Amino acid sequence: FKFTYFVDKKSPVTKLSFPMAYDCSFEGTLDGDNYRFVLGVKVPVTTLCPCSKEISEYSAHNQRAIVKLKVNYDRQKYSIWPEDMIELVESCSSSPLYGILKRSDEKFVTEAAYENPKFVEDILRDIVVKLRKDKRINQFETEIEAFESIHNHNAWAYQSEGVKNNETTF
């Protein structure tokens, strides 16, 4: 089941509230007594190139990226909301995206990204570390694609793991 999930999000400086839309999904299967539930989210974020920052005197190139995350967890024991996974992903990026930004917000976002440069591999690694530590999650799959602003290709990274209960495939 796919749906658009709206989260009321405030801009970082002016605190203007605006709904952000996230593509989400629920997948459920029942095989005998084995019930499996998967929550999926697609989270847009900003990445800022560490290499570009290191070699440039004035700036660095950045791009919008989409992180796709699916988590399998026991709904009988735990609750995980789309917001939980959205916040996890955004905390691992160079900067979150916002629905509305005034100039002071734009300054904050671009400077925050500049102070937190990350390749897609860095973002993926940070997400994986947090997911491995989350006792609620049995299994996960995460993928990130950055829509490169100065290259003729996109950057991409992927990882899937069964963390608990001997899960090995997604």
Residue map of PLM features:
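N-terminal intrinsically disordered, cationic/polar leader segments
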Residues: 1-170
